[in-house]
């Protein structure tokens, strides 16, 4: 074992083993290694961890005592975890040694040394012979090599797949160009056979003849062997590249066409006598179909690229105005919140036909057409004359309303804004199947008086409201509605019913209060009120007269007095007056 490996093992023993032990475990280790290290009493007391490591390296030169340390630590319970660490470190060192031994170069033998030193006579003879055979002009040489046919058979699919890991020869197709970028590793047997052939042959072209008979995988190694010879008559690299014809191959392939000898990493162009090498070694036959996808860099002509792919033309019709608003024309979308203004729509917007089933916007506010919106909250300014006739034929499908919305959504071409939270409903866009709010009419005043004894206060409020309306006619409800757009049918009916109830004469209300019996559906009530009801009703009537005073009309005062007289004329009230309360009523 080399000294470097022993040094690695010693580092593990000292740094990963002895340094992690406490004093007690270290003294126990010295005691257990007493016979192996031949420690005396003084040595056990004086030697520290470094001296023990040096002594273990001396006594166990194989691994610096690492295996012995692991064996001893297994017997100590406190160092059981340290044993696994030491074994892992030991395996790492062993793996390093294996890798280094495999990657170490082969030593040069005497036969190899003799092969590198080729006799100069053979080189001279071969160079002279090659000078006679090579034409002097580059044009004639190019035509000659192009006319020659390859002497080697083409590789089949199986041989090509098997030889992908081997060095690439110029005859090989570019399908295995990835392996040609790697440094070729020549097998030892092929080198020895070729070198032995070059030594034993007497003819100057024996080596080239032998190389022509071997498979294409061994030809590359033979060419690299012949490359070391100092041949004077060889083909320069410029002649190799001049054989490529740019007329028959596209520009993308010309950029990737290189001779395979030049592509080899760390190797020069193979210099071989031209008489022994056929044209297939010099002119690599490259076809665009066989190039790798990573190697091909096709230059697409400008005419083949469509114009729409070069510039992305964004039409205004595809621009969105908000987060949840559908795609619509920019000419019809405004971000104003209260007063949307609709401008003329171009004819290209007429093709926007969107059904309601495709529009599922998670908004609670209905989106209706700006041309038909009439809401008490917004005042849209619409110019119907600017819309063309065919632009108003947008397809609307109210039956396909989305369940996530509370109201139908119509075409996006005329949406004023998607940010308005106020519901905008018109009589044109609301279908018959749309669920209208069922407004139950107000309870009759008789039932209120019969069930609630304090209904007189509500009556007083109604009187005050009518008096204020008579005094201030400009603040009424009728004038207030004149400034607003007309309501829908349901709202108009409700408003008319409410006005009719408010416009009832006060005499009718007083008659219902004093003379008509209460009518309820829950239970049957006696036609005459009880004593307690009459008592409270009398007090409320007296308070009504006192609070209103001169504000009430003469007719109202007269009816109130008639009601009090009618209540005082009953027998029960007379009995009640005998109890001491008749004085106040008579005075009134």
Swiss-Prot record:
Domain of life: Eukaryota
Region ranges (Disordered): 157-183, 469-526
Swiss-Prot/TrEMBL GO biological process terms: activation of innate immune response; cellular response to interferon-beta
SMART domains (UniProt xref): PYRIN
Ranges of Polar residues composition bias in the record: 172-183, 470-487
Residue ranges annotated for the Pyrin domain, each copy included: 5-92
Intrachain S-S bonds: none
Pfam family, one: PYRIN
Cited CDD domains: Pyrin (cd08305)
PANTHER family linked to this entry: INTEFERON-ACTIVABLE PROTEIN 208-RELATED, INTERFERON-INDUCIBLE PROTEIN AIM2 FAMILY MEMBER
Family, as annotated: Belongs to the HIN-200 family.
Protein name as annotated: Interferon-activable protein 208
Gene, per the UniProt record: Ifi208
